C-alpha cells in the first residue's frame, strides 16, 4: 500500500504498488480482486483518523462511524474496478466507499445491528507500507476506443472508478481530441 486517503467523506482512494518486476497489462475499465483475510476490527481503534483527514472527520463523528465494529470469519475476495489507467505505472488505484449498515428507522437513531461491509472495512484500516494480495485484471467493461461515435459516461460515487480509467486513457494516452465525450457524475450530499 502506498496511499490510502479519503477523497470524499466516505470514499477512499486506495493505491497499491505492484512488487518489483511485476507489471499488469490491462484495458481501462477492468477490475482487480483483493483478498480479505479473517479479522476483527474496531473502527475507533483500527482506522487511522489522519488518513480520513480533518475535512471529513466531523461527519464520521456525527454519524457515529467510530462506534462500528466488524468481523470477518472466513477469508474471501472482493472485486473493485481500477481507477488508474495503464500509463500511470505499475500500481493499482481503487476508489472504495465504506459500506455502513443502514440507519435505524425513525424515531430510533444510529445504525441497524448488522455488520458493516467486510471488504470496505478492511481496506479502510490499511496504511502505507501494509501488504495486500490482489489479482487481475478481469472484466469486459471496455469501450470501443477507435470509434468516432460519441462517448457518454454516467457514474456516481465510487462507481466512477472505471470511467476515470477510460477517460484518462482516451485523453492522456490516445490523445483523442476530435471525439465528442460527455461525463455525467452524481454524488450524495450530507
Give the positions of each predicted feature.
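FNR/FR-type flavoprotein reductase catalytic core
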Residues: 68, 98-190
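Ferredoxin-reductase
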Residues: 1-128, 187-189
Amino acid at each position: 500500500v502506498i496511499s490510502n486517503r479519503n477523497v470524499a467523506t466516505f470514499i477512499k482512494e486506495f493505491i497499491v504498488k505492484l512488487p518489483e518486476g511485476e507489471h499488469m497489462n490491462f484495458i481501462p475499465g477492468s477490475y482487480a480482486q483483493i483478498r480479505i483475510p479473517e479479522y476483527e476490527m474496531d473502527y475507533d481503534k483500527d482506522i487511522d483518523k489522519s488518513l480520513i483527514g480533518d475535512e471529513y472527520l466531523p461527519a464520521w463523528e456525527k454519524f457515529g462511524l467510530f462506534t462500528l465494529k466488524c468481523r470477518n470469519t472466513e477469508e474471501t475476495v472482493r472485486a473493485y474496478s481500477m481507477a488508474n489507467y495503464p500509463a500511470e505505472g505499475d500500481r493499482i488505484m481503487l476508489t472504495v466507499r465504506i459500506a455502513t449498515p443502514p440507519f435505524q428507522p425513525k424515531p430510533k437513531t444510529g445504525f441497524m445491528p448488522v455488520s458493516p461491509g467486510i471488504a470496505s472495512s478492511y481496506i479502510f484500516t490499511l496504511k502505507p507500507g501494509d501488504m495486500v494480495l490482489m489479482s487481475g485484471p478481469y472484466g469486459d467493461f471496455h469501450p470501443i476506443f477507435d470509434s468516432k461515435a460519441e462517448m457518454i459516461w454516467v457514474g456516481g460515487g465510487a462507481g466512477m472508478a472505471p470511467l476515470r480509467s477510460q477517460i484518462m486513457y482516451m485523453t492522456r494516452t490516445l490523445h483523442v481530441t476530435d471525439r465528442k465525450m460527455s461525463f455525467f457524475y452524481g454524488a450524495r450530499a450530507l
